[in-house]
Amino acid sequence: MQFVLHKTASGVTRARRGTVHLNHGDVQTPAFMPVGTYGTVKGMLPRDIEAIGADIILGNTFHLWLRPGTDIIDKFGGLHKFMHWDKPILTDSGGFQVFSLGAMRKITEEGVTFKSPIDGAKVFLSPEKSMQIQYSLNSDIVMQFDECTPYPATHDEAKKSLELSLRWGQRCVDEHKKLGSTNALFGIIQGSMYADLRKQSLEGLLEIGFDGYAIGGLSVGEPKEEMIDVLDYIANDMPADKPRYLMGVGKPEDLVEGVRRGVDMFDCVMPTRNARNGHYFVTGDVDNAGVVRIRNSQYRTDEGPLDPECDCYTCQNFSRAYLSHLNKCKEMLGAQLATIHNLRYYQRLMQGIRDAIEQDKFDEFVTEFYSKRGQTVPELNLR
């Protein structure tokens, strides 16, 4: 992997424009990665994902390991051929999914024992096993196995958790090298909401050495102000010559705020999940902060496109009234068209950000973004 930093925005922001060169292609940053949990972005054919402009998608190590299993994916030479996607893939390590199991799991120094959510069977996942699974998947970016610190956590709990993740991180690097993988391996910064612990985690990861660094343990129930606070004091301390990835955070305004603080990569289920629930992101809707809730009665007879500024297949061919009808009838096509639009909205947002950075107009872009949503630009408190 190679990361090329092309430009840093002028002004007070830390926005960056770059390219991540990976085994299956290049990723233009800042980038948003659609989530394909089971080897599919819900409701999207691979050609649809390419058409909306995505350079990279995310797969889920935990779920793909349990079903269909790496024995089957191995027969295809990895996840790319299995799902007919020839561009880059990032896979998470399974750490967040294990965290979400709650009482169904037991964490030790060696790894995590848990009951399979599929059949209740006892399963063990370790740093080494996570690396082996991701090696079989042949993902372009492999994530270290970590413990996602719950929120809220005491300082002592967060410290013990991050130190366990650091020890696991070293084991991940050792196993990654042992396997002879040529794919990139990213470390994950933990430490809950504590500035000193986030710094300790980052310093520990830098000592181990990774190809890129991610900010984990956010979007787990904390107030948005605390999430932004973490970004304010940790993002700029991350190496400038490596990609910076904010995990699982994905409201449009969160992406903009992350970029303002120097983040390069994002992922979230929000655009696809919200699409299935009738919430569509649009460029300009002052009254509704950039969201059309298609189930509202006002759209039943609306002949206009979902978003007049959008170039996606949905907006170019269908009315809000038709989308309202499909949603009301729970038609499969409705969810598919909504997903196409929401993911295209996210890719257009990131393209606009990249163009603005290149043209030294990022501050103007941010002002216009919030203005179209009827919001004021949040204050930057960089440290």
Swiss-Prot record:
Q: Which superkingdom heads the taxonomic lineage of this protein's source? A: Bacteria
Q: Which GO terms describe its molecular function?
A: metal ion binding; tRNA-guanosine(34) queuine transglycosylase activity
Needed cofactors:
Zn(2+)
Cofactor remark:
Binds 1 zinc ion per subunit.
> Which residues does the annotation say bind Zn(2+)?
C310, C312, C315, H341
Which of UniProt's keywords are assigned here? Glycosyltransferase, Metal-binding, Queuosine biosynthesis, Transferase, tRNA processing, Zinc
Q: What is its EC number?
A: 2.4.2.29
Gene3D superfamilies for the chain: Queuine tRNA-ribosyltransferase-like
Q: In which pathway does it act?
A: tRNA modification; tRNA-queuosine biosynthesis
Question: Where, by residue number, does substrate bind?
Answer: D92, S93, G94, G95, F96, D146, Q190, G217
Catalytic reaction list: 7-aminomethyl-7-carbaguanine + guanosine(34) in tRNA = 7-aminomethyl-7-carbaguanosine(34) in tRNA + guanine
On whether rRNA processing is a keyword of this UniProt record, the answer is: no
Q: What does this protein do?
A: Catalyzes the base-exchange of a guanine (G) residue with the queuine precursor 7-aminomethyl-7-deazaguanine (PreQ1) at position 34 (anticodon wobble position) in tRNAs with GU(N) anticodons (tRNA-Asp, -Asn, -His and -Tyr). Catalysis occurs through a double-displacement mechanism. The nucleophile active site attacks the C1' of nucleotide 34 to detach the guanine base from the RNA, forming a covalent enzyme-RNA intermediate. The proton acceptor active site deprotonates the incoming PreQ1, allowing a nucleophilic attack on the C1' of the ribose to form the product.
| UniProt name for this protein | Queuine tRNA-ribosyltransferase
Whichever gene encodes this chain, its name is tgt
